[in-house]
Amino acid sequence: MKKLWGGRFTKTAEEWVDEFGASIPFDQELVEEDIEGSLAHVTMLGECGILPEGDVEQIKGGLIRLLEKAKQGELKFSIAYEDIHLNIEKMLIDDIGPVGGKLHTGRSRNDQVATDMHLYLRKRVEEILGLIRGMQRALVAQAEKHVETIMPGYTHLQRAQPISFAHHLLAYFWMLERDYERFSESQKRINRSPLGAGALAGTTFPIDRHRTAELLGFADIYENSLDAVSDRDFIIEFLSNSSMLMMHLSRLAEELILWSSQEFQFIELDDAFATGSSIMPQKKNPDMAELIRGKTGRVYGHLMALLTVMKGLPLAYNKDMQEDKEGMFDTVKTVIGSLKIFTGMIETMNVRTDVMERATKQDFSNATELADYLAAKGVPFREAHEIVGKLVLHCIEQGVFLADLPLDVYKEASPLFEEDIYDALHPRTAVNRRNSAGGTGFAEVRAALAKAKQLLSTP
């Protein structure tokens, strides 16, 4: 089959070679963006007097019909035309005749595909921003219910100090806020038009690049035609931002997996986000959380793959850059799906407040309270630390907890201990005393919730 670019060639490639080089199996994802870009391009060609009005109207009519079919999923693509651009051009020519071939005037597939991807990512990043906000709202809604729910806080996965469960949830709120800021800020670089840069050097036609940028809603154009067609920074930045977002989701997924286990029993995930076993009738597996944890690795892989593709490419376009799309599409799908799943899991999980609070009374996570108690009475903290460490060792040897020790044992360790030590040892008191800025004290958590809600209400 004759290629649309085949004039210089004396023989055609074998079918298997065409299949290896074709991108249509995956870049058909860009069909709507490709047609939208073409509509802006042909409109500009008409306004600049490069194409007659009659040709422009014919081409626009054909493109609009193709766009309607694309939205209905009615277009059939062929590997013979290798990519989304040539497939659409062939369909247009079949519909309106040879005049359809004028669409490509003053344009290359190099600036065309770059434009498509800018349009595609701009839409998807907006969707991701909305989903991040949705998950943040779910976290805030759960946190509001659990300001005074006490749980063990951990370091090294060992119980460290008691904290408010709301405080723990809000830690993820602020991680997601940084993700939101990164994605939002990246739109400045995504929202820039490469259209009109041509293959690499611009075009001899008197086009108006600012006009096509305006028609497509771009804030600006690329200032250098070589940069315009060879830049994939905006995709790499998207993959990097997605990797950090998925890392945050994976960390929370790991905690939900642990908390829902028989060993913790802090939460129960809704049945809609769990599965059973084909052999063990009792099992309720946190599969959705595990999948998100697993899918994080593929997003990291896509980032490293594209960095590796781009690291040695001379200017301007190289066929290697065709490898930018599948990882981008898969990352978009993974991030959007993960955020939707996570929002549902957070909204519907059952929190076992009694188990959480009981866990804070069956360990030594209140030991810091004793050290702080002595330090507040003038004992150097390192000396206080040593005294309390010996008390903890005594408890371990006796099989009891700090709250079980009689006052005379405390007095023997330090005469500064008084009856009020037992109030300080209570987990709820320990949590509520930590009212330094950003701390887990109930007043601070409520202030943090108010700040989070105000942020969510800001357009």
From Swiss-Prot:
Keyword Heme in annotation: no
Gene: argH
Listed GO MF terms: argininosuccinate lyase activity
Protein location: Cytoplasm
Taxonomy, superkingdom: Bacteria
InterPro entries in alphabetical order: Arg_succ_lyase_C, Argininosuccinate_lyase, Fumarase/histidase_N, Fumarate_lyase_CS, Fumarate_lyase_fam, Fumarate_lyase_N, L-Aspartase-like
Catalytic activity: 2-(N(omega)-L-arginino)succinate = fumarate + L-arginine
GO biological process: arginine biosynthetic process via ornithine; L-arginine biosynthetic process
Pathway: Amino-acid biosynthesis; L-arginine biosynthesis; L-arginine from L-ornithine and carbamoyl phosphate: step 3/3
SUPFAM superfamilies linked: L-aspartase-like
Annotated Pfam families: ASL_C2, Lyase_1
UniProt entry keywords in alphabetical sequence: Amino-acid biosynthesis, Arginine biosynthesis, Cytoplasm, Lyase
EC number(s) recorded for this UniProt protein: 4.3.2.1
GO CC list: cytosol
The name this protein goes by in its record: Argininosuccinate lyase
Similarity remark: Belongs to the lyase 1 family. Argininosuccinate lyase subfamily.
Record bears the keyword NADP: no
HAMAP family: Arg_succ_lyase (MF_00006)
Enzyme class: lyase
